[in-house]
């Protein structure tokens, strides 16, 4: 499952709908450990494809193979066909895979899950070596 949300949220409907504020929280499939109720079950990625800044789609039930490993769930850009590994946001198919680092991985947001099961987004480190920059990428 997944949910799309703005970050940082401003309360202004127009600003909160800007593409560069759109992130998607993804609960990993069970074959990737997604049944756990801790932070390891979740990923948050910027929805802006690092290839040409289109907004990607999360295909929850899609079976994919990356480097010989098969799993469920894929991030796909409908504009030019870039695909990203749901586990780490690194491109594995399409034009984004041909881009030099750090322009081949989706920026992320850190998160934690508290004792009540609530998910909290933590302040990001926007360095390319950390959580990355929307539209540019990050090092993986």
Regions found by a protein language model. Name each.
Residues 44, 72-74, 79:
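Disulfide-bonded cysteine motifs in exported proteins
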């Amino acid at each position: 499952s997944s949910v799309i949300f703005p970050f940082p949220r401003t309360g202004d409907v127009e600003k909160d709908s800007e593409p560069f504020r759109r992130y998607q929280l993804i609960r990993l499939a069970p074959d990737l450990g997604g049944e756990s109720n801790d932070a390891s079950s979740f990923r948050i990625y910027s929805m802006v494809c690092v290839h040409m800044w289109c907004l990607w789609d999360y295909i929850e039930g899609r079976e994919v193979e990356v480097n010989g490993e098969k799993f469920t769930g894929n991030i796909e850009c409908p504009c030019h066909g870039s695909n990203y590994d749901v586990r780490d946001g690194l491109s594995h198919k399409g034009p984004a895979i041909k881009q030099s680092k750090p322009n081949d991985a989706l920026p992320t947001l850190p998160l934690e899950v508290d004792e009540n099961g609530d998910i909290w987004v933590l302040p990001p480190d926007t360095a390319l070596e950390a959580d990355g920059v929307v539209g540019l990428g990050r090092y993986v």
